[in-house]
A protein has these predicted regions:
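Core domains of carbohydrate- and sulfate-ester-processing enzymes
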Residues: 16-21, 37-39
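Histidine- and aromatic-rich segments of cupredoxin/plastocyanin-like copper-binding domains
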Residues: 37-38, 45-276
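OB-fold nucleic-acid-binding modules
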Residues: 80-82, 278-284, 337
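C-terminal substrate/ligand-recognition segments
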Residues: 287-340
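Beta-strand segments within the central parallel beta-sheet cores of soluble alpha/beta enzyme folds
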Residues: 7, 43-45
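Hydrophobic or amphipathic alpha-helical targeting/insertion segments
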Residues: 1-18
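Extracellular/periplasmic ectodomains of large secreted or surface enzymes and adhesion receptors
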Residues: 262-304
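Gly/Pro-rich turn-and-neighbor structural signature
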Residues: 21-27, 31-35
Length: 340
């Protein structure tokens, strides 16, 4: 749906940032049309692809270990470049791959060595992180706009920097909506920014356990190369889909950016109380009575399994610790009931 639909809703997400009625969140979009403006609301379908020796798209439908391409496309464009104006944008990033996971970062290129991370040896450039806010996911808008700026320990591991300008791992068909302001954080007209993939795959069965570091990828300490193998050219020393995959070039903006400031909707963090809510949750995690309801609710566990052999049940689902069954449309393992 993200690739073909407008994804606009009648109240909160109007697609017109100028409407100030106390309901519309005024997300970056534009204001020329009554609703559904897309000037500053951009869909990005990110996917890996492969081509054969004749330049034709190639795919192996019999590969049950997960298909991996060796090139990354955005909206079916190779090495895309997007001119952006010096203002806020909303990017709806969808993982359109068959088997590949992504871990996407945003950086700005800086002439010389004044950036946080050095570029490749002899390149004459360095890079700095570009903070942004995560405002939505597969379930559409979230309760708060989460800052990816190093101000919060987002995964509770004690390290605030591992999500500074770096999104969480993004699974197949998973969507992240972010707001980037191209007029803040030292960004100037003419600057070049890049989306960077930090997630390595060695097989299609799943990504490597830990994502790669921005320092290693931007310096090209980690960089796949082509070598001649027994069957012809092949990739060596890494995953070719790791690295920069989309460039944005900042253009001047003479208009007035009237879209919302996501910082006003941030969750509570050290030294700052919680801001406004975009979508109030049905259950309040700070309400003891609501948490009692959650504990009293019935919890189910589904475990999806796969065998490495060629037995009669290569794909199975276990329900609540039971047996692993293969697909049978006549069997009901979990029948949800209202208010349970």
């Amino acid at each position: 749906g993200n690739a073909v639909m407008m994804n606009y809703y009648s109240a909160l997400d109007r697609g017109n940032e100028a409407i100030e009625d106390g309901v519309n969140l005024r997300l970056p979009s534009g204001s020329a049309l009554p609703w559904g403006n897309r000037d500053y609301d951009v869909n990005l379908v990110v996917a890996d692809k492969a081509w054969d020796a004749n330049g034709q798209l190639w795919f192996n439908p019999f590969n049950t270990d997960g298909f991996l391409g060796d090139q990354i496309l955005v909206n079916w464009q190779y090495e895309p470049r997007l001119k952006v104006r010096a203002r806020s944008y909303r990017f709806r990033i969808l993982n359109g791959s068959v088997s590949r996971y992504f871990r996407i970062a945003l950086v700005r290129e800086i002439a010389g060595n004044g950036g946080e991370f050095p570029g490749p040896s002899g390149s004459g450039v360095s890079y700095s992180r570009v903070p942004f806010h995560l405002i939505g996911n597969d379930g559409n808008l979230m309760e708060h706009a989460v800052p990816f700026d190093g101000s919060m320990d987002l995964d509770g591991d004690g390290d605030k920097q591992n999500h500074n300008a770096i999104l969480p791992t993004q699974g197949i068909a998973e969507r992240f909506d972010i707001i980037v302001n191209f007029a803040k954080n030292g960004i100037k007209t003419g600057d070049k920014l890049y989306f960077v993939n930090l997630m390595e795959h060695k097989t299609g069965k799943g990504p490597e356990k830990n994502g790669l570091s921005l320092a290693d990828v931007l310096s090209e300490k980690y960089k796949a190369v082509i070598k001649q193998g027994s069957k012809g050219p092949e990739w060596d020393k890494g995953d070719p889909v790791v690295g920069k995959f989309m460039q944005m070039i900042v253009q001047p903006y003479t208009g007035q950016d009237v879209s919302m400031n996501p910082a006003d909707y941030e969750p509570a963090k050290p030294g700052k109380a919680a801001g406004k809510k975009m979508i109030p949750l049905t259950l309040d995690r700070d309400n003891a009575a609501d948490m009692v309801k959650v504990k009293a609710a019935r919890h189910r566990e589904f475990i999806f399994g796969r065998s490495d052999g060629t037995d009669e049940a290569p794909w199975t689902i276990k329900t609540d610790g039971g047996f692993g069954y293969d697909m049978d449309s006549r069997r009901i393992s979990a029948a949800a009931q209202l208010s349970t």
